[in-house]
Each structure stands twice: as structure tokens, then as C-alpha cells.
């Protein structure tokens, strides 16, 4: 069974029911070990005390917050448990919003919400209510040593929860503005036509991580002592004639749509 990252209650009005959270996704990355270049042996991480000038055991380490240079306040795990707010065990629904109202830029992490024993009926009713009203629930939840704003929505006859960034966590200063420039009505028409030609249902199973596949191939080739061939990177020249580039793009998209899609060969 998948690891449970949180257990508690969802509460709205006078109704509450027990739930659990499981991580909905995790990146499928390839992990490399750190090796000593000289003999390719594993390198170990050592915790080192700067004052005593010697290695120490992990059990001797505590958390500390620096209040001024070189002065720390030690914070124990028990201290954090004592100050945990009610949202550490109960998600109180604060409001409901239309499903398209929250900008996806606020989405942080996703979790599956499962019903715990005794909460099946209320869970099913909550899913049905969200489905029928096309609304999502906004609540607060404490886990991983912080309090999150969360969005709970119905998906495939179950509940999914997304933690959200707080407004101050968004780096709005990094946002780019659209350049002030002019384009013709014909250029806009061609751009819209290109969008229409490339519009298709989203099928995530059709996408794959080419970089990961290349790394796996690289590892296998080096294991066999084979030659490593560099992947050719496309060199795109700056667009000089935007109208002509749009026309050619639309034509290429039309041709691609007419051609039957071939099955992708298995790796």
C-alpha cells in the first residue's frame, strides 16, 4: 500500500469524515551515486562538528534557528508538535470556488484523498456534491511543518487535493510582460488557424521523457564500452518573415493531420 502522508478529517458545516492523503505523483528521475574518481568507490556523507573538529553521529543533531550571528535557538520535534494548529488533524472547508477560478500557477503538489473507515458515505456525498455544482473546496491543512492552503476537487469519482502557494511565494517580479508590438489581422488569423490545426485531446500516455531515455541509453552504451553519439540539437534561425513562417507552419500542420499516425516502436 502507498505511504500515507497525512491522516485526519475533512470538515464542512456540521459534517466531518476521516480521510488519508497519498502522494499522487513523483518525478521518475535517474539517480547517480557519488564516487571517488580515483577508484570509483562510494563516497559517504559525514556530519562534522566545526567546534570539536570531529565527525558526529546523526542522532546527535538537532534543529536550530539562527537569531543572530553564531547564536541559535534549538527547536525539538516535540516543540513543533505542541504548537501544531487544529489544521494538523482537521481540514476545515473555508469556502467553495468555481473549478476554473484558481490560476494553475498557484498549484504546488498533488495528493489522492482516500476515505478512512466510517467515512465512506460522507466521502461519496462530498464527491457527488462537488461534481454536481462544478465547485472546488478551499481549506487549510498542516503537514510537513507548515500550514498549506489546499484545493480539493472531484476527479474520476474520487477526491484529489492540491496544495497551493501563498501569494507572497509567487515571484511576480520575474513575470515577463508581452512586448508592445503590432501585428496584422491576417497574421492573427494564421496564428489562430495554426492553433486550431494543432488542437487535440490531451492524452498524457502519448508523451515520454526523451532525456531520461537518452540517459538510460547512455548508461547501457557505456556499460558495453560502446561509442557515445551526441544528439544533434536543432539550430533555429530567427524568424524574418513572420507571415511566411505562419503559412508554412499551418501547411505543415495540415499535412501532419492528414497523414495516419504510425505506431511508436518499443524501446
UniProtKB/Swiss-Prot annotation:
Q: Which domain of life is it from?
A: Bacteria
Per the record, the GO terms for biological process are: DNA recombination; double-strand break repair via nonhomologous end joining
Where does the Ku domain start and stop, copy by copy?
10-190
Pfam families from the xrefs? Answer: Ku (PF02735)
Has keyword DNA repair? yes
Q: Which GO MF term does the entry hold, naming one? A: double-stranded DNA binding
The record, for InterPro entries, names:
Ku70/Ku80_beta-barrel_dom, Prok_Ku, SPOC-like_C_dom_sf
Alphabetized UniProt keyword annotations: DNA damage, DNA recombination, DNA repair, DNA-binding
Membrane spanning segments where?
Answer: none
Q: Identify its protein family.
A: Belongs to the prokaryotic Ku family.
Assembly behavior? Homodimer. Interacts with LigD.
Functionally, this protein is described as follows: With LigD forms a non-homologous end joining (NHEJ) DNA repair enzyme, which repairs dsDNA breaks with reduced fidelity. Binds linear dsDNA with 5'- and 3'- overhangs but not closed circular dsDNA nor ssDNA. Recruits and stimulates the ligase activity of LigD.
Q: What name does UniProt use for this protein?
A: Non-homologous end joining protein Ku
What is the native source organism of this protein? Solibacter usitatus (strain Ellin6076)
Point out the gene that encodes the protein: ku
